[in-house]
Amino acid sequence: MKMERLERTAVEAQLTELSGWALNDAGSSISKTFKFANFVEAFGFMTQAALAAEKLNHHPEWFNVYSRVDVTLNTHDAGGLTELDFKLAKAMEKAAARGVV
């Protein structure tokens, strides 16, 4: 299924539902830094997020150092942001809710 790139107004509307996510200057990706109490919590979050990503067949760009996980989402095939990015962001929020400091 081909996902259509969202218009800037739709992206901004979706962002109002997500705390702490930022739109990059080009409007082509969203990002957030998640902070946890320790590496085990960070890795647990990444595991849950990976399962959600696999279910959606949509995978994040992320970077982990100890208790911090930096996430960037976009849809390469669409050249910007799609509904999939926001579905994955919401799934990540649920995964993080149990351990974010």
Swiss-Prot record:
MF GO annotations: 4-alpha-hydroxytetrahydrobiopterin dehydratase activity
Chain coiled-coil ranges: none
Classification via Gene3D superfamilies: Transcriptional coactivator/pterin dehydratase
Reaction it catalyzes: (4aS,6R)-4a-hydroxy-L-erythro-5,6,7,8-tetrahydrobiopterin = (6R)-L-erythro-6,7-dihydrobiopterin + H2O
Database matches in InterPro entries: PCD_sf, Pterin_deHydtase
Entry EC number(s): 4.2.1.96
Listed GO biological process terms: tetrahydrobiopterin biosynthetic process
Keywords, comma-separated and alphabetical: Lyase
EC class of the enzyme, as a word: lyase
Entry-linked NCBIfam families: PRK00823.1-2, PRK00823.1-3
Family the entry assigns: Belongs to the pterin-4-alpha-carbinolamine dehydratase family.
Name of the featured protein: Putative pterin-4-alpha-carbinolamine dehydratase
